């Protein structure tokens, strides 16, 4: 099953779920749950029984904050049932993740410039935030970087740290993370070139390397990751474009292939997926391909857990296209299949035990 988070212009829009034919790459609509506002970014519980979505809004009840919603997943059909909702403690939550134990949802608030963790009950319901950290400061490009903008949050391979890319600060902030209590505590940061605009972040399957995609400069930073100390040491900066940056261009998503040999990043405006080969000894990147996403504004994409297909989500053209992945080169090839989904923002895969 493939779940698609979206921006909602009407009450009828919401979270979509699709079936992916693993033989051909064909996508077919399976269901939709409407009624929630801007369930843009999604995360699936490690036990595969629950799904969580940010509600990317600025006002939740009496707070200047967004929200996070919890859903149960029907193990046979993949259908979602709303469970409950809690404040994200900051405005416009745009990214979330569950820790490895499934006890906590960690959320990044973009306009709020903050992060929070919300405990998860055994029945999948969310409890009020157990930890909240407000970022402060600014960076080079005003007004874009006049304030902090937490754009993503990831949990380290050892489940000991939370790593936050802040577009407004040009920093990747590291927090010690206690999964039992859901507490985050500051543990340092890595700076990037001023004006870069850190957006999304991905760890290598080996746990040795990490990758940051920068929205404003359309670059990738390669880091060595020290799980013992929670330290990031920069190795390389490489452009995501094969040409000079043009007006209206920006990056969006970054993901590492499950086999750890390739990395993918999306370029909005240029409307491509950049493919890179990963040096297995050093973690450094070398460019392989720039594949058109066949639509406009690839805000997100997903790689299926087997590593066979990539699904590109084109926000502005309202469509998703599937691409087969060459296991030897990492190159993408269109399957010829696509499907219309209004304003897609996030792609998440789930292999249902009941299927």
Task: Say what each PLM segment does.
Residues 1-21:
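An edge-strand/N-cap motif at the start of beta-rich repeat modules
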Residues 8-11, 56-62, 111-114, 169-171, ...:
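Short glycine/acidic-enriched loop and turn motifs that connect beta-strands
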Residues 11, 36-46, 89-104, 136-159, ...:
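Beta-rich, blade/repeat-based domains predominating
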Residues 28-34, 81-86, 137-143, 185-191, ...:
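A short beta-strand motif characteristic of beta-propeller blades
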Residues 315-355:
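Blade-level signature of beta-propeller repeat domains, shared across WD40, Kelch, NHL, RCC1
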């Amino acid at each position: 099953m493939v779940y698609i988070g979206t921006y909602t212009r009407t009450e009828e829009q919401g979270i979509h779920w699709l079936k992916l034919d693993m033989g051909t790459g064909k996508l077919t609509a399976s269901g939709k749950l409407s009624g929630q506002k801007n369930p843009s970014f999604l995360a699936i519980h490690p036990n595969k029984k629950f799904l969580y979505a940010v509600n990317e809004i600025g006002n939740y009840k009496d707070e200047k904050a967004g929200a996070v919603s919890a859903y149960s997943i029907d193990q046979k059909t993949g259908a979602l049932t709303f469970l409950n909702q809690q404040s994200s403690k900051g405005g416009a939550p745009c990214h979330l993740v569950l820790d490895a134990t499934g006890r906590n949802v960690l959320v990044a608030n973009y306009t709020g410039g903050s992060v929070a963790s919300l405990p998860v009950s055994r029945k999948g319901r969310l409890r009020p935030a157990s930890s909240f950290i407000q970022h402060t400061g600014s960076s080079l490009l005003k007004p874009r970087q006049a304030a902090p903008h937490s754009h993503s949050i990831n949990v380290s391979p050892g489940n000991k740290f939370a790593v936050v890319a802040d577009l407004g600060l040009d920093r990747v902030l590291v927090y010690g993370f206690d999964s039992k209590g859901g507490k985050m505590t500051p543990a340092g940061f890595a700076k990037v070139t001023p004006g870069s605009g850190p957006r999304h972040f991905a760890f290598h399957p080996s746990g040795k390397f990490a990758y940051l995609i920068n929205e404003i400069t359309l670059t990738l930073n390669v880091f060595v990751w020290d799980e013992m100390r929670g330290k990031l040491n920069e190795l390389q900066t490489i452009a995501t474009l094969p040409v000079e940056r043009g007006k209206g261009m920006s990056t969006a998503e970054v993901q590492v292939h499950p086999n750890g040999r390739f990395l993918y990043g999306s370029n909005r405006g240029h409307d491509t997926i950049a493919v890179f080969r990963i040096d297995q000894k050093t973690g450094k990147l070398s460019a392989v391909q720039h594949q058109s996403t066949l639509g406009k504004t690839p805000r997100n994409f997903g790689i299926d857990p087997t590593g066979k297909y990539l699904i590109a989500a084109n926000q502005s053209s309202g469509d998703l296209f599937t691409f087969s992945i060459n296991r030897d080169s990492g190159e993408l090839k269109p399957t010829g299949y696509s499907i219309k989904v209004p304003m897609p923002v996030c792609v998440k895969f789930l292999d249902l035990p009941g299927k």
